[in-house]
């Protein structure tokens, strides 16, 4: 599974995620391993996959297809293309492998980006997801923040932090503290943690 969060204000957009993933042995026992879940899409956009582990190969397949289709740079156009692409990929995975064990039947993708042609501040977040292996994936409303899986306490804290105009450095530190706390109480969440920002200067990986 994944613990991920993203948000933006006038100072920029940030993304943060853990790297622990779960697979199951032939006997149905969970095994944990680590993999990167956060990837740039061009210069000003990013995708963060979460939930079922298949989100990562689907994210990489989407990135490869976007790279192949030159000119697909606008985040809204990317999301419009990604919705059927990821739905088809997830459907093929389920047909081949069957449903995941109970409690692991969620997959989601956070799309983030900057577009100078949009009204200020020019940042966007989109969330595509599926619960209980539902197909096709759905576009889930997101305004200027996403916390997945949802955590009401963190959502309130992040809402206040964004509203007060905290700089990206402080928003990233809040995210780091949250991820570390979740790793202490949830075995499916763990380091290393990955962070990135998107500003008018583009996508940037951050080390904390």
PLM region descriptions:
Residues 1-208:
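N-terminal nucleophile
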């Amino acid at each position: 599974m994944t613990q991920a969060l993203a948000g933006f204000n006038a100072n920029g957009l940030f993304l943060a995620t853990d790297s622990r993933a779960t697979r199951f042995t032939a006997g149905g026992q969970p095994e944990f391993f680590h993999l990167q879940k956060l990837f740039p899409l061009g210069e000003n956009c990013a995708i963060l996959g979460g939930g079922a582990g298949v989100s990562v190969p689907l994210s990489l397949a989407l990135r490869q297809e976007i790279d192949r289709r030159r000119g697909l740079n606008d985040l809204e156009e990317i999301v419009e293309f990604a919705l059927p692409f990821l739905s088809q990929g997830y459907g093929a995975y389920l047909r081949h492998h069957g449903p995941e064990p109970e409690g692991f039947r969620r997959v989601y993708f956070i799309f983030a980006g900057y577009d100078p042609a949009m009204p200020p501040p020019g940042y966007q977040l989109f969330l595509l997801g599926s619960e209980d292996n539902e197909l096709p994936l759905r576009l889930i409303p997101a305004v200027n923040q996403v916390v997945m899986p949802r955590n009401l306490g963190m959502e309130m804290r992040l809402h206040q932090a964004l509203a007060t105009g905290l700089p990206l450095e402080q928003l990233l530190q809040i995210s780091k503290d949250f991820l570390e706390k979740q790793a202490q109480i949830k075995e499916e969440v763990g380091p290393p943690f990955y962070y990135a920002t998107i500003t008018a200067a583009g996508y940037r990986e951050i080390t904390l």
